[in-house]
Amino acid sequence: MVVGIGAWGPGFSDWPTLKTLLRDGVSDTPLTVANPAPQIIPANERRRAPLPVKIAVEVSWQALQQSGLAASDVACVFGSGLGDTEITDYMCRVLTTELKQLSPTKFHNSVHNAAAGYWTISSGCMKSANSIAAYHQTAGLALLEGISQCVLQQEPVLITLFDTEAHATYRQIFPCEQSFGAAILVQPMTAQPINAQSKEAKPIVLTLSNEQPAVAQVELADPYLASLAATNPAAGILGLLSLLAQSPSAQPACTSLGIGPARAISLTVEHRQ
């Protein structure tokens, strides 16, 4: 079941705000939001952390706080379809110069599991930390990995997805123009939510199919959110989040996410009164 959710993107800096947007649509006001500055990262490290890391840690911290669980007891799965294209561009350009002198800080932040490293060190996480990259299949594979681990290991798992606006050099192949991050914290159905804020905990049923399932992806009515979901790999989770945003009186609803050629997972959200 889902016991914590975090979110950040243009027009929203937390789950309650995104929840309203998913229910009511995007307003006509400019969709802006300040870059996150997760206080859980020490100040010196926070100044050096790139935007993808800040987004990932911010939404992870939001979900953890909502759950009431201790970070040391929660395993984590981080997923980013693009990685940090700003640093990728920087490293490629520097390596074409005669001296090839890379910034140690940028090189340190260039690894794909940088966000997981910042999170585990800053939060005190003592459980496993995985990082996944699969372009537009990233959201589906991260959810498959995290939910499977939750069920098989009978432990809570934080699933964090994040992707930032692609650097202009890569825009023709990665048409991602908006940054987005979201995290959901799942725990086994046998466990009881320990935080009053988690009284809206919602069970999720996951089904693996060898072919594209009969269940279609949830269509987002709002054009802005639909575009975000189509172009930002991490935002592929918006269909699932739209189901989680529904009122407790809503009927069980399904969505699907691709995890590879002719292969997908189906997710069913069951709301409790």
Regions found by a protein language model. Give the residues of each.
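Conserved "HGTGT" condensation-loop signature of ketosynthase/thiolase-family condensing enzymes
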Residues: 1-107, 111-112, 116-128, 162-273
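Active-site-proximal alpha-helical scaffold in enzymes
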Residues: 56-61, 66, 133-156
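Nucleic-acid nuclease catalytic cores
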Residues: 158-160
